[in-house]
């Protein structure tokens, strides 16, 4: 099932890239239109990677729920972190659709909270392992999940940065056109 989903995502990514290339070749867009097409080609990769990370998390969860107990503080923190990362994706996609630079800046700023959560949970897990080395597998599973969540947040930031590019022609404060 996971392999099939990955194939579908990869196929959709290639289709979007193909359509963008066809637009570039046939229409020879300039200025804003060129930035929009370039952004679509870049953003599709981030969206595909978000899907890959979500798939990786889904693969870990069935085992994780057997080794971590309900009410586990690290799991509760990870769930809160996941909600923040999810909101970043939602906000980044809304900013992209509306070409809203202010909304994009808010997504970029929100990444600090996800990064903070990642480091806090990682520290908690390190303490857990130090206190009881037998818990290393359960801690590593959760560590993988939070790393994927952190990367999802980073991909949402990338999408937001491309929104800024559409609006300004600048990517990460560097003029591209």
Question: Predicted regions span which residues?
Answer:
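A structural feature that tracks compact, well-ordered secondary-structure segments
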Residues: 41-65, 92-96, 104-108, 115-122, ...
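Hydrophobic alpha-helical transmembrane segments that form the multi-pass transporter/flippase core
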Residues: 9, 16, 114, 121-125
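Secondary-structure edge/capping motif, primarily at the C-terminal ends of alpha-helices
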Residues: 1, 20-27, 61-68, 89-99, ...
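Hydrophobic/aromatic-rich structural module bridging two neighboring secondary-structure elements via a short loop
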Residues: 18-46
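Conserved alpha-helical segments that form or flank metal/cofactor-binding pockets of metalloenzymes
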Residues: 12-20, 51-54
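Divalent-cation-assisted or electrostatically stabilized phosphate/pyrophosphate-binding catalytic cores
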Residues: 28-38, 69-86, 97, 101-112, ...
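Short, small-residue-biased leader/transition segments that mark boundaries at the very start
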Residues: 3-8
């Amino acid at each position: 099932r996971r392999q099939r989903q990955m194939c579908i995502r990869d196929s959709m990514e290639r289709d979007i890239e193909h359509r963008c290339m066809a637009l570039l070749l046939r229409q020879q867009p300039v200025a804003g239109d060129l930035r929009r097409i370039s952004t679509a080609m870049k953003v599709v990769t981030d969206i595909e990677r978000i899907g890959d990370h979500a798939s990786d998390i889904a693969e870990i969860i069935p085992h994780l729920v057997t080794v971590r107990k309900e009410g586990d503080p690290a799991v509760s923190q990870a769930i809160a972190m996941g909600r923040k990362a999810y909101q970043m994706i939602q906000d980044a996609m809304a900013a992209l659709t509306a070409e809203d630079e202010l909304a994009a800046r808010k997504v970029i700023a929100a990444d600090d909270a996800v990064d903070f959560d990642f480091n806090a949970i990682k520290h908690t897990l390190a303490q857990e392992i130090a206190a009881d080395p037998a818990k290393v597998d359960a801690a590593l599973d959760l560590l993988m999940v939070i790393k994927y969540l952190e990367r999802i947040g980073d991909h949402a930031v990338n999408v937001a940065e491309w929104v800024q590019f559409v609006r300004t022609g600048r990517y990460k404060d560097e003029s591209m056109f």
